[in-house]
């Protein structure tokens, strides 16, 4: 029998110490990685619940195990809430990740060797959209589109490649593209060649939920998202459809094809996050995320930095560091010393290797969750620029770190 009175710190002090150190790091550092966010205590409570004990292969009302009557309620709550959130008729909340959700979409209607048309990883796409190092680029004949000379998504190229290659599926969505994507234009192109349209909105889902980014669901055959990032839930994935045409194929692609038992504790946490995103205050959050991203980009431009695509219309943007004569890798390290967390990121046509890069990616979701407003963000942007203009000066880094600490103390991640 397990005792509820035995704490992690008592049983495993080494692990507890590492967790405590990470907790302190999150408090003391400003998080600007676009794919990261903070979840509520309610989300963590659900994910840390005894639902982790329950195996539940199958779907609500149709399980391969007994004793699933209560986890059925949990999963159905998650399904109903996410359908309401995005106006979908179909939802599968079992994918363990966005990548597995994407794999399931491909497997539901494609055969190995079929042609897919997705955004180039080098221009801001995602590994799972046909990159040669990913299973999507190994199983399928992947053709890629990118940005035009103004660093705007090249819809003319998308149409030209679609007409030339006749893909069975067109993939839209990105992991490092700042501007809004025209889902209706993608639908028009897909219809011209009889292709399925699949949108991966993992980065934008929270903005979509908050009404600050166009909803792809009405235009697409398939939509996937992660449940973290801007949606502010646990790490996991979801598949959505505007109707139930592909329900059977998608369900079987997840189980039994790609996964076994679902992670019921994570699905419970997803349900909590979906409820949070349905609240009026989430709309204000999404609005502030966009305001903060735009303010930071604007302030960095004032300091002489170049923003890829010239601006942002979402939560994310790329900074081209080539004029600063510093690599993304070096910038990430220097900013880290100042307690500002970013990730190095390739820019379009980047001459550097993927582990070096010529840019960094900045996102506003996590700092907005903490409570940062536009004025705070402008201060922070100047601190970022201070580091990038003198990345090897330890006194400069210490001065910036002190100011970052003051900002972090003003906005604790978790209050009383």
Swiss-Prot record:
Cellular component annotations (GO), alphabetically ordered: cytosol
Keyword flag Transferase: yes
Any one GO BP annotation for this protein: glycine biosynthetic process from serine
Predominant place of localization: cytoplasm
Highest taxon listed in the record's lineage: Bacteria
Entries under PANTHER family matching the protein: SERINE HYDROXYMETHYLTRANSFERASE
E.C. no: 2.1.2.1
Pathway recorded for this protein: One-carbon metabolism; tetrahydrofolate interconversion; Amino-acid biosynthesis; glycine biosynthesis; glycine from L-serine: step 1/1
Residues noted as binding (6S)-5,6,7,8-tetrahydrofolate in the record, renumbered to the chain: 121, 125-127
Residues with N6-(pyridoxal phosphate)lysine modification: 229
Catalytic activity: (6R)-5,10-methylene-5,6,7,8-tetrahydrofolate + glycine + H2O = (6S)-5,6,7,8-tetrahydrofolate + L-serine
Subunit note: Homodimer.
Localization: Cytoplasm
Family: Belongs to the SHMT family.
Record-linked CDD domains: SHMT (cd00378)
One protein family per Pfam: SHMT
Presence of the UniProt keyword Cytoplasm in the record: yes
Site entry: Plays an important role in substrate specificity: 228
Record-linked Gene3D superfamilies: Aspartate Aminotransferase, domain 1 (3.90.1150.10), Type I PLP-dependent aspartate aminotransferase-like (Major domain) (3.40.640.10)
MF (Gene Ontology): glycine hydroxymethyltransferase activity; pyridoxal phosphate binding
Protein name: Serine hydroxymethyltransferase
């Amino acid at each position: 029998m397990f005792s509820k009175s035995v704490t992690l710190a008592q049983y495993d002090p080494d692990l507890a110490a590492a967790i405590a150190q990470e907790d302190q790091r999150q408090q003391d550092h400003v998080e600007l990685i676009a794919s990261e966010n903070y979840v509520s205590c309610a989300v963590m409570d659900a994910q840390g619940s005894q639902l982790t004990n329950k195996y539940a292969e199958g779907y609500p009302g149709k399980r391969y195990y007994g004793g699933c009557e209560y986890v059925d309620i949990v999963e159905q709550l998650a399904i109903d809430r996410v359908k309401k959130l995005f106006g979908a008729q179909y939802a599968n909340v079992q994918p363990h990740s966005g990548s597995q959700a994407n794999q399931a979409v491909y497997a539901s209607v494609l055969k190995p060797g079929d042609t897919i048309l997705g955004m180039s990883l080098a221009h801001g796409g995602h590994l799972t959209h046909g990159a040669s190092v990913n299973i999507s680029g190994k199983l399928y004949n992947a053709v890629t589109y990118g940005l035009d000379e103004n660093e705007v998504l090249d819809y003319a190229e998308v149409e030209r490649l679609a007409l030339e290659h006749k893909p069975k599926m067109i993939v839209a969505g990105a992991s490092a593209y700042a501007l809004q994507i025209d889902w209706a234009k993608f639908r028009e192109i897909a219809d011209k060649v009889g292709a399925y349209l699949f949108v991966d909105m993992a980065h934008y889902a929270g903005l979509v939920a908050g009404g600050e980014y166009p909803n792809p669901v009405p235009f697409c055959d398939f939509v996937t998202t992660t449940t973290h990032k801007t949606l502010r839930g646990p790490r996991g994935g979801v598949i959505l459809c505007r109707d139930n045409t592909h329900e059977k194929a998608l369900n079987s692609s997840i189980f039994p094809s790609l996964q076994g038992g679902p992670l019921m504790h994570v699905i419970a946490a997803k349900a909590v996050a979906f409820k949070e995103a349905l609240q009026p205050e989430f709309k204000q959050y999404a609005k502030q995320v966009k305001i903060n991203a735009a303010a930071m980009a604007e302030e960095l431009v004032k300091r002489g930095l170049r923003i890829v695509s010239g601006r942002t219309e979402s939560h994310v943007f790329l900074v081209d560091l080539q004029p600063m004569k510093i690599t993304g890798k070096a910038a990430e390290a220097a900013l880290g010393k100042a307690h500002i967390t970013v990730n190095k990121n390739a820019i379009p046509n980047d001459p550097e290797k993927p582990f070096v890069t010529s840019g960094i990616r900045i996102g506003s979701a996590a700092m907005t969750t903490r409570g940062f407003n536009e004025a705070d963000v402008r201060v922070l942007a100047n601190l970022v620029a201070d580091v990038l203009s003198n990345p090897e000066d330890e006194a400069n880094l210490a001065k910036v770190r002190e100011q970052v600490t003051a900002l972090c103390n003003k906005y604790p991640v978790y209050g009383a």
